[in-house]
A protein has these predicted regions:
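Walker B catalytic acidic pair
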Residues: 270-272
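Pre-Walker A (pre-P-loop) alpha-helix and adjacent loop at the N terminus of AAA/AAA+ ATPase modules
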Residues: 178-211
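Short glycine-rich substrate-engagement loop in P-loop NTPases that contacts/grips substrate
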Residues: 193-197, 234-265, 276-282
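AAA+ P-loop ATPase mechanoenzymes
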Residues: 1-187
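Conserved AAA+ ATPase "SRH/arginine-finger" region at the nucleotide-binding site
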Residues: 321-333, 340-354
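Conserved catalytic/switch belt of AAA+ P-loop NTPases
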Residues: 259-260, 275-321, 327
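Walker A/P-loop
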Residues: 211-241, 254-259
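C-terminal alpha-helical "lid" subdomain
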Residues: 346-405
Length: 405
């Protein structure tokens, strides 16, 4: 393929148009543009090669590996249509053509690029010092077909690269370094978590799944359970979207955006509570009741709360003049009943606390006699305000750091 063809095919990408915004591919396009322009000086070309390689080497030295991963993870109209079960014939033809070109591009070397731009007589030793990136051979069309068949688990676009997201200005933003909590690292409360896990498995299987409320005492592992479940089932196609309380009104729009996505989503609201006149109360109630649009089958709302009834009562709430005050309070407190599944996390009694401690001590390889460990932990818990898994973990971390001896 001649330089002009490489350059034209890059500029002419349709299905994979978004690749031109990729930081590495964009540098390659700039390089071929400069070479195609026929720069009389080698300076601009050397600069473009160096810029391309610097961008590539931030990730890998293998250009073929980088480009193939970018292709497989790209969000395109083809992958969206295929996920919905129908791919237009014209788009299929365009997809096949571009995959054929991109496979060739995966094998492009610097020497080959120079040979297409300059005759052997015209090449100069000034270019010899430039490093040579690696390439790889692969059947990109077959790899892409395989990826399309697994899109319900691996996703596309940012959902292929990340599994935890937050919401900023109505848009999903990937969390690059999510909490790495694993279920195996959470001793105790197995029965409570199993209910949430079973509901999550139903969601992943495309079966009816409940919205879930995890409520109970602070520090009992409610939030950790949700995050660990998200980590555990990410390879199965689960994604977690953390929604703040003041963003609840955005949930209907988020559901609309995610409804056609082949992945499954948990909209996670942590530490949920309201005052009686909170506008967010009405928003969440409408969402849970399904009165704001229909609930998508690939989405469930999981919330944690330290209060069973979610509503923070004040003295004025209890002594107001409203003749319907009792009915109002009843309506407010009934919000918790709108969750299909509620799971209680209670502060552990002494025996349960000690079991959690011993398991955490094993995980962290704490070398301390059991009797001494339990006595010190009990004293630590008293100073910390009571027993809880969080307190147990804090104590073990202090032992690991040498603070507790």
């Amino acid at each position: 393929m001649k330089l002009r063809e490489w350059n034209a095919h890059l500029h002419g990408l349709v299905v994979f148009r978004a690749l031109l915004n990729d930081p590495v591919v964009a540098k390659l396009l700039d390089l071929t543009d400069r070479m195609e322009a026929g720069c009389s000086s080698y300076g601009p070309v050397c600069d473009a090669v160096a810029a391309f390689e610097a961008a590539l080497f931030e990730y890998t030295t293998n250009w073929g590996s980088y480009l193939s991963n970018a292709v497989l993870e790209a969000e395109t109209i083809c992958v969206r249509q295929a996920a919905a079960g129908q791919l237009d014939a014209l788009l299929q033809s365009a997809l096949d053509s571009e995959l054929q070109f991109l496979q060739q591009l995966c094998g492009l070397t610097l020497d080959e690029l120079f040979q297409t731009a300059y005759s052997e007589q015209a090449q100069r030793p000034e270019l010899a010092f430039l490093p040579r990136w690696q390439t790889c051979e692969l059947d990109l069309a077959a790899a892409y077909a395989q990826r399309m068949s697994e899109v319900g688990k691996k996703g596309y676009g940012m959902f292929a690269k990340h599994h935890v997201f937050t919401v900023e200005n109505g848009q999903l933003v990937p969390v690059k370094y999510p909490d790495p909590q694993r279920l195996s690292e959470l001793p105790g409360y197995e029965k409570e978590r199993e209910k949430v896990i079973a509901n999550t498995k139903a969601l992943l299987a495309g079966m009816p799944a409940n919205n879930v409320l995890l409520y109970g005492d602070a520090g009992t592992g409610k939030s950790s359970a949700v995050k660990a479940i998200a980590n555990e089932f990410a390879p199965e196609g689960l994604r977690l979207v953390e929604v703040k309380k003041n963003q609840l009104y955005q949930i209907p729009d988020l559901m609309d955006k995610l409804a056609a996505n082949p992945l499954k989503f948990i909209l996670f609201i942590d530490d949920l509570s309201f005052t009686a006149n909170d506008d967010n109360f009405a928003a969440l109630k409408a969402i849970l009741e399904g009165s704001v649009g229909g609930r998508a089958q690939n989405i469930a709302v999981y919330a944690t709360s330290n209060r069973r009834h979610l509503i923070k009562e004040t003295l004025s709430d209890r002594t107001g003049d409203d003749i319907h005050e009792a009915d109002t309070r009843q309506k407010l407190m009934s919000l918790s009943a709108r969750f299909g599944l509620t799971v209680t996390f209670q502060r552990p009694e002494k025996a349960r606390f000690e079991t959690i401690l011993e398991e955490l001590a094993k995980q962290h390889n704490i070398q301390m006699p059991t009797e001494q460990l339990l006595l010190k932990a009990e004293a630590f818990a008293l100073r910390a305000g009571g027993r809880s898994p969080r307190v147990a973990k804090q104590f073990i971390e202090q032992c690991e750091a040498g603070v507790q001896k």
